[in-house]
Amino acid sequence: MITDADVAAFEECISGGGVAVFPTDTLYGVGCRPDSEDAVARVYALKGRAPGKPAAVMCFSLDALPETGPRTRAALEALLPGPVLVVLPGGVGVRVPDLPAMARVRVPVLQTSANLSGGPDPRRLADVPASIRDGVDLVLDGGELPGVPSTVVDLGRYEETGEWEVLRAGAVPVERLATELNRDMRG
């Protein structure tokens, strides 16, 4: 269970340029400030991840998301918070996890799964490789998590055309996405 003290420690760690392992609504993540080159390099090095491979920016409330057009904003409000990563125009991926305990975190977090690149998804803290746990500044234990990765949906053209594409199947069924994203296309 995440406490208020955990949330404060997390926000302090991330704000200060640190790297943290933390629970999300799907898997354990490892993250840092997206504007800290050193911290981003640490995250990628800990995972053994190729430097050019993208990572998502996690916000902990809808209010913290970047400005979008009205159609895209309505889609974000229908899908988030929840286990969906949305790719916006320009290729930026954003997430708002369904984590009420973390809702007061006001700093964005560059986040990726807390595993070695290509490794199994960590649903328990013990599943996070020791090399990652030992290489970060803060570790938060949220118990056992669902273990199903987030669904990734590309809304890059959604504002103009209403087109969307699932890039990775995951925790949210495609049928639910279709219901929400095709809503304004119906009569």
Predicted region positions:
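Active-site-adjacent structural elements in enzyme catalytic cores
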Residues: 1-187
